[in-house]
Amino acid sequence: MRNFEYFTPTRVIFGKDTHLKIGTVLKEQNCRKVLIHYGSHSAVSSGLMDEIRSSLDEAGISYVTLGGVVPNPRLSKVREGIELCRKEQVDFLLAVGGGSVIDSCKAIGYGLANPDTDVWNFFLRTETPKACLPVGVILTIAASGSEMSGSCVITNEEGWLKRSSARNDLCRPRFAILNPRLTYTLPQYQTESGCVDILMHTIERYFVNIETMEITDSISESLMQTVIYNSRILMKETDNYTARAEIMWAGSLSHNGLTGCGTGGGDWACHQLEHELGGTYDVAHGAGLAALWGSWARYVYDANPERFAQFAVNIFDIPCSTDFNKTALAGIEAMEDYFRSIQMPTSLHELGLDLTEKEIHDLAFKCSFEDTRTIGVFKQLNMKDMEKIYLAAR
């Protein structure tokens, strides 16, 4: 196992109607003016924005609003937010939404607190942020875990590059308000895509090619089992509060570093491969991960079939054969069967993408930073490897 540091400064306020406390929570932050950042019109039409405004008015907190964040959040919206916040002298950022809104808020926070640096440089990782304006969250989509994480992902429309910032505790939200009822109105596809994203944040940390800690493995496996079980419930009962609550809390725990303790950080190849899909073709992140995972797993499992066999036995109750390869492959198939059971794609075709070999080559070229980097630690992947995985996923 590897040495590690575990730090979770985010205050979690969990449960029914907790978003109604937002005025009091922000007052405790001693902020003068808040940006309320949100995504689609649903935050307005549902009455959520009215409730937030009312709570802030009651607390005597000034605010401005900026909506229009889309999935795979855009750099142009980040720049718009930075300009607005400078003009309005905002000193706190409130994200009302899911991972895209939270990540957009974090990027705005970086841009405001580092005025002499182009914010995109933090995503190219050519510069490191020295500060970040504080961020708080009212979560409406359980998926990304960005409400407790120290990273964010932004898409630059120039070249359609989707890039993540380096992990940095500066951008971890000060607080996250988690009311499972706010996720009731999500479309089924978005709910289940979010469940895949939650699973993958733990899976990326689970599949490492080193000796891991038994306690971390047990936490990770329990979290994965919980997500699989409750995501199936939500296929039939979209307003099941208990299932929604389990999924929402799992989303936060899956990406706050807990399931990576002692693992050295994780593999993250599948995420890197999906970032090119999401940036280029604007697909839902979780669905893109589901479409790629089986091909990635079959390509790399032979680097440590025993680890994949452990996954198969402990997550899907597959009998352990003396042939670890056989058990490993059975586990990969079981995972794909699970994706199908929640109507998630297991190929690029099912994702709605029928890509040519040239288009796949271009994805691998971008993912490898023009053939200058490898990805993954379970098995290091160069550009040719990436291309083979994309091709196998067709």
What residue ranges belong to the model's regions?
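A glycine/threonine-rich phosphate-anchoring loop and its flanking beta-alpha core
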Residues: 114-212, 310
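Active-site segments that bind and position negatively charged phosphate/pyrophosphate groups
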Residues: 205, 209-334
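Short glycine/serine/threonine-rich phosphate/pyrophosphate-binding segments
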Residues: 19-22, 45-48, 75-78, 100-105, ...
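ATP/NTP phosphate-donor binding region
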Residues: 1-92, 348
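Short Gly/Thr/Asp-enriched flexible loops that form oxyanion-binding sites at enzyme active sites
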Residues: 51-52, 82, 101-115, 148-149
